[in-house]
């Protein structure tokens, strides 16, 4: 499909213009978690800086006050705004005229609800790692709080920020592939193959400690991503799931592999395979959607292209930022076609859209939300429990 620089160059100019416009009106943000050696903490901070929409002013980086202040200072923060407890941060920041307007939460999922609840009391907007919580009742309660207080809540299902994944969604919406019949999502990783029992006390403890990872490590870590991707691209909902969730490792006790078959609300069928026990697997996230008129395929290993096949026709390769893609895909890009974009840019799209939603909220304007929301989080935690229940009942079909 033809390639053009026009769309992407316009997008870059628009972003530069927005960068200048928003320089005087940045949203003050703080972070809970993501201390030293945290990849996800680094990712959140980088994503928040990408489009110059946030001013990073405060945070909790350790339960140890000295360590939190030292790390905050290394990030350029005023040490008076580096806390060791989220309740103290919420109280002190709410008392300031220049206090945080938003917080990013990147702690174990069991802590998400109580942290978010504390800041919602002060009308602080939330961007949170997935899964939303570790309990269904906490997720439902959090959703009610968000709506009651009219808070903007974004969930970092960051893969939905990839431009060409968004293009796949647009092709589905335009009925280019017809009625959806089959959906396949897979996400193989391989790190638990080499994990040993002693690693449960290492930096992997969030994933390997049952008390921290919730009812199922693999479903919480990447199963929710696969499930969200299926819903996001197709616009469909999963009605029922039949699952086999287990641990293939002899060294650890948490789940590290899941095979799932799903029934969609349009009677389509789908399959999801997620694993951290796939030897050699890195982050091979892949989605394929098959319909009556065509099919789309996207792979994170090659994120700047989308394969689109029309019925009785050859497969087309659509490239990011080309003249063939939708406005949404163009708006989600930063550099001209031919230059690669990847994980960090996709994550940054969620942050930028979070900022857009906050600005609309402050002006009391209604805005169609592009980023994942608290509702997506509720659906994700319900999916975890349904799949785990199915597995415990010998793969019985369970409604979500």
Task: Set out the residue ranges of the language-model regions.
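Glycine-rich, aromatic-lined ligand/substrate-binding cores of catalytic
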Residues: 220-295, 300-304
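Hydrophobic residues in well-ordered beta-strands that form the structural core
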Residues: 128, 134, 153-155, 184, ...
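N-terminal Rossmann-like dinucleotide-binding module
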Residues: 13-77, 355
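Single conserved hydrophobic/aromatic residue that forms the stacking wall/gate
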Residues: 1-12
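C-terminal helix-rich "cap/oligomerization" subdomain common to oxidoreductases
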Residues: 13-25, 104, 339, 353-400
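C-terminal glycine/acidic-rich active-site capping loop/insertion
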Residues: 16-20, 158, 259, 264, ...
